[in-house]
From Swiss-Prot:
GO terms for biological process: protein maturation. This is Uncharacterized protein C106.07c. It comes from the Eukaryota. The lineage of its organism: Eukaryota, Fungi, Dikarya, Ascomycota, Taphrinomycotina. InterPro entries: FAM210A/B-like, FAM210A/B-like_dom. One of its GO terms (cellular component) is mitochondrion. It comes from Schizosaccharomyces pombe (strain 972 / ATCC 24843). To A.thaliana At2g20940. Pfam families: FAM210A-B_dom (PF06916).
Amino acid sequence: MSNLWRNLKSVRLPFRRAPTLPLYNVPVRRSISSSSSIPPSSSPPPRLTITQRVKELTKKYGWWSLGVYIGISVLDFSASFVLVRTLGAERIGYLEHSILNSIRRYFNWEIPESTASGEPEAYHSSIWTELAFAYGIHKALVVARVPLTAAIVPPLAKRFRGPRIRP
């Protein structure tokens, strides 16, 4: 009889299952209760400064954001310079002339004599003064360059990176 019992133990019958612990058979279900959830904050997140926005954009999109920002900056500065050169060369020349004369008077330097005839003096600004004015306008437009960069970079990066790579 002992041989028969050993043979029956070694035979695997279809109705016989391996023993399992009841803990592993029960599916784990977690309920979401209102007490464990994070309460919604009543205050909106703080607004980021321009520098923080640029850093965040650079972290997310890398060289794409830097390239777009530099491209917009080049266009912005060149447009500012063209506007200063065409629209305000004589006005800037007058300002430059009056500022330089004030400095010369302050330090008792020799002031160049104006034209002897009764013709009005033509004021010509130097290229460096025009560049300085264009740079001032360019710096004032930083509040427009950053949002424009933030609007252009995501679709541009998505288009050129391809559909499989997330930005």
